[in-house]
Design a protein with these regions (language model features):
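Conserved SAM-binding strand-loop segment of SAM-dependent methyltransferases
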Residues: 4-14, 212-215
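Conserved P-loop NTPase mechanochemical-coupling segment
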Residues: 1
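Short, flexible loop segments at the rims of nucleotide/cofactor-binding pockets, characterized by
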Residues: 6, 57-62
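Class I S-adenosyl-L-methionine
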Residues: 18-29, 33, 37-58, 68, ...
Length: 231
């Protein structure tokens, strides 16, 4: 079995076979939608700051994953949150009402105003407003990158300490960074593209270093305060 708390450069179909049934408490995934995102124009409106960042065209979004992917995802995880669920309706279990909506906070552009996520939870539909400009703060490395804040929101809804989280298409690594920030969660990510995986691992390592430094500074501050009280 593969180690936890790592992002692997491998095909998720092979990776999921490494784990027993129901190993992960929650899968939060963002598979290809099959809409040819690399073929969409970079210019999205008259305001240059809203334009897409130029990314290497890799032609990974030509088709949605096969049915076998969704069955394997359901096998290895107890619950699922699947971004782009509206593209995969024939493959998903029907009857669940707990859809999520990411309102991008920028309306009237050539891209969609929002994105939908299917969930396996019977909960009310929830909406999260997070402007795409937030990606500028994260640092954009992937054409369909989602903000870390969006994943943090999803985790706040469905994840609890001690859970194991899976992301089969980690892309920029935003979901894994959100897991690390929340604390108390184990995670596994897969990314088949070597370039994206390398960049995502760099982002994750930077986040881990930042939090370690913050924790160290906090410890030093507590020690200094304790010394003041004992003098």
């Amino acid at each position: 079995m593969l180690e936890l708390n790592k992002l692997y450069n491998m095909d998720c179909m092979q990776g999921m076979k490494e784990f027993p049934d129901g190993f992960f408490d929650l899968a939060i995934v963002d598979p290809p939608y099959g809409i040819g995102i690399d073929g969409q124009k970079k210019r999205v409106c008259g305001n240059p700051k809203h334009n897409r960042k130029e990314h290497i065209r890799k032609s990974w979004d030509k088709a949605i994953p096969p049915l076998e992917y969704f069955r394997e995802l359901e096998r290895v995880s107890k619950a699922q949150v699947i971004w782009g669920g509206n593209y995969f309706v024939p493959y998903l279990e029907q009857g669940h009402k707990g859809w999520l909506v990411w309102d991008k906070g920028q309306h009237g552009l050539t891209m969609s105003d929002c994105e939908l996520a299917y969930t396996s939870f019977d909960t009310p539909t929830r909406v999260f407003v997070c402007n795409r400009v937030e990606l500028l703060n994260d640092g954009t490395i992937h054409p369909t990158q989602k903000p870390v804040k969006l994943y943090s929101w999803v985790l706040s809804l469905f994840a609890r300490k001690g859970m194991k989280i899976l992301d089969t298409h980690a892309g920029s690594g935003s979901s894994l960074i959100a897991c690390y920030r929340q604390g108390g969660l184990d995670f596994v990510g897969f990314e088949i593209d070597e370039d994206y995986c390398r960049a995502a691992n760099e982002r994750l390592e930077q986040e881990q270093a930042r939090i370690r430094l913050f924790d160290l500074l906090e410890q030093e501050e507590r020690k200094a305060q304790a010394t003041l009280f004992t003098e």
